[in-house]
């Protein structure tokens, strides 16, 4: 044994111990560093690698009619997404083959037929990288179940579902512009969905899901994995009750469809309102759309013309001007008015609609037969200041404030800028622009005894816990006329239907009050568009104790275009169905004509009818044209329409020239141009 060998051994042992202490100390320090100093950071790193956080929303609130019948509802449904980073090629374990399985290609080929898309497009998504790509959102339950089965049967990685809310509009096109629609992120984009988005939008909660290194989901706290069915959850939701009556809305929608088919109008609007409360019972606009598939329709069809279209009202404005004259004491129903068929104001000549005069008649006859000359005389006596002041009192010139987006306020002159012709034309409903809702609201003030009401369409809003957070109620904005003036105008408007130009609105057994209107349409660049008209009718029933007030407006109907021809019959047919459906019994009413006795176009019975020329059907099917000279526009339309001939009119008054000329033989659907003066 070498000297000092023991000491060498002892030194080596000491050195080894020191090394062990250093190593253990290093490990302990590293553990302390990782477990204490870096603990939070490592936890977050682990969480980010093995979990993903997503937001789950509750279903959107319901929209129902006044009786609780659902119009817009939501259910929770599956939305499919991919995590391309987790879709790695792998060994084909299912078939026990020692080959690599192309997960991306297989997934694309299997899913494409169900998702109704191109497999190559899906493959491009799967190979594009990233951690989250939507494949299809808010799938139908049956479709989602098919995809779940494919994922489970083929053990596909990186494909998962999230629950999202899907909106259904149960009435399809009914009240489409009122309800509006939502986008893919559950955000209201139009109508009440937009206006009440804060109320209807569901709440959101963040959830996590756990997956393994290859993307297979281990635990779905919010996400439904392929082994579980996607089931809609029953949740307490906010509910918006509308003033709409679904039965009335259905009748109105059908009437509008029929009107558009018959008249080929460019657009239309109709509103039914409770004249004593301001509740909107029905509202329809054309063209329309199905909010379940709003993207398939033109944005023009999303517009609610009942509140957003402004137009010159024409003769339906005359009862408003008449109330001004009655209130100011300028006229009474019996005040004699001289009607010569035409009246000159400054450098402008204004004619009656048919160019004829009736001599001296009471003011009630001016309203009954819509005599322009009589209304112009009243307008000139009222003057610009009073015309505009009263128009504002009746609610024109400012939005009504209904709970719908996109409402227009109309257009009124500044009285300081009005010349005499402006005053004269405003008295007959020109030079003033209104919306259908504004016009109906003003007429309701006549129907209810003088109260200008705040129209409303939300009956109440009930929170998820049952608390009523808003409740609609009758609101009187102001009293615009006295009960006496309202009664006098109601009586005059009743004679419009029973004896005057609005006979086509009469419903046998019921007292109807109303007014027709036919106005030239404003051209985009100023002035009036040749041959384009707005045809309207506004009225209420029963005339003495109104239950329903209704306005019908047709934009540019083809062929017949007078309000008495196209709009009044819609009023009649719609309200007749509603009165029967609601059990409102007819009352004895002397003087109401039967349908057989009605003059089809509301001609003036007091006027001597001219002998009209005759069109001849030739053996070869062509139609021989007569000479239209001396006829008014209405008679010309009545002659052409049965032979399917179209009128393109120029000017107003009586015919003096035509093309093709008299004696020409033309085919059906030919357009006949006639110049009136």
Regions found by a protein language model. Give the residues of each.
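Hydrophobic alpha-helical transmembrane signal-anchor segments
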Residues: 8-41
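Juxtamembrane extramembrane loops of integral membrane proteins
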Residues: 54, 58-116
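Short, small/polar residue-rich loop motifs at catalytic or cofactor-binding pockets
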Residues: 55-59, 264-267, 455, 649, ...
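Soluble non-cytosolic domains of exported or imported proteins
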Residues: 58, 98-105, 137-142, 186-190, ...
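Beta-lactam-recognizing serine transpeptidase/beta-lactamase-like catalytic domain environment
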Residues: 72, 215-231, 270, 275-315, ...
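Small/polar-residue-rich segments within soluble enzyme cores
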Residues: 101, 106-113, 124-236, 552
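Conserved, well-ordered alpha-helix/loop/beta-strand core segments that scaffold catalytic motifs
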Residues: 223-268
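Ligand-recognition elements built from short beta-strands and adjacent flexible loops
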Residues: 509, 523, 552-556, 562-568, ...
